[in-house]
Amino acid sequence: MRAKQREIIDALKVKPTIDPATEIRRSVDFLKAYLQRYDFMKTLVLGISGGQDSTLTGLLCEQAVTELRQETGDNDYRFIAVRLPYGEQADEDDAMMAIDFMDADEVQRVNIKPATDAMIQAVETSGKPISDFNKGNVKARQRMIAQYAIAGARSGAVVGTDHAAEAVTGFYTKYGDGATDICPIWRLDKRQGAAMLAQLGAPEHLYKKVPTADLEDDRPALPDEAALGVRYEDIDDYLEGRSVSEAAASRIEDWYAKTAHKRHLPVNVYDTFWQE
């Protein structure tokens, strides 16, 4: 195994194999313990895209609050699934299929288009035009503003969908979908998450569809793998300690180095990671 590969695996806590049922239990218990530790928190708030990661995380959230209601008799424990479309989203049917399957306690819908467009317009009147890529990051951050507004109104925690295959590549928006309170699937790679969804009986389409962040107007539904230049199969193999091609390993390690700032708090004078 490559030295850098071992370092990354240790940092992201990825196991070479998992028992899906055990990891489901671990994630649910983690969510329950967090809510019970902070007795002012009663809700879990999660944005639902209709992809694998939010579907899995939503199922874990719903199971956690259902068990808490049963065990404590406190019916204030709730899971709020949030749809956050930019206007009309092409994956709306998938998102609603996921929400229906997870049987969320509540569903809220916030159209981020007016706020996003207003922000873009306000910035552009005072400076240079905002690129389509930059606008995509604004969309991601507007979605988190909405989720935190809901969580603040409902004594809630915002739940993240970040996992090891995203963490290693930094494939999320800084202070966008990377800005959450709790990440129950953080240690898992992509195929391990799919195995957990299969264990939970989720519709195959939701975890076999092509993953996409779908943030760019100019390149709608751009596959993650096209944006990253490496397959999730190779990322998962790498994180599980298997051999991958030199090209794939170098690509993964390059992403890991370039996106180190996303896995840290804001840089201060004592930090050295950015110099490595």
Swiss-Prot record:
- Domain of life the protein comes from: Bacteria
Task: Give the Enzyme Commission number.
Answer: 6.3.1.5
Binding positions for Mg(2+)? Answer: 53, 166
Q: Where, in this chain's numbering, is ATP bound?
A: 47-54, 161, 190, 212
Binding, deamido-NAD(+): 141, 174, 181, 261-262
- Report the enzyme's class at the first EC level: ligase
What InterPro entries does the database record attribute to this sequence? Answer: NAD/GMP_synthase, NAD_synthase, NH(3)-dep_NAD(+)_synth, Rossmann-like_a/b/a_fold
Q: In which pathway does it act?
A: Cofactor biosynthesis; NAD(+) biosynthesis; NAD(+) from deamido-NAD(+) (ammonia route): step 1/1
Which GO cellular component terms are attached?
Answer: cytoplasm
Gene Ontology terms: biological process? NAD biosynthetic process
In terms of CDD domains, this protein maps to:
NAD_synthase (cd00553)
Q: What reaction gets catalysed by this protein?
A: deamido-NAD(+) + NH4(+) + ATP = AMP + diphosphate + NAD(+) + H(+)
- Give a GO molecular function annotation for the protein: NAD+ synthase (glutamine-hydrolyzing) activity
> Which UniProt keyword terms apply here?
ATP-binding, Ligase, Magnesium, Metal-binding, NAD, Nucleotide-binding
**Similarity comment: family membership:** Belongs to the NAD synthetase family.
Question: Its function?
Answer: Catalyzes the ATP-dependent amidation of deamido-NAD to form NAD. Uses ammonia as a nitrogen source.
Describe its assembly.
Homodimer.
Query: Which PANTHER family does the entry mention?
Result: NH 3 /GLUTAMINE-DEPENDENT NAD + SYNTHETASE (PTHR23090), NH(3)-DEPENDENT NAD(+) SYNTHETASE (PTHR23090:SF7)
Full protein name: NH(3)-dependent NAD(+) synthetase
Highest classification ranks of the organism: Bacteria, Bacillati, Bacillota, Bacilli, Lactobacillales
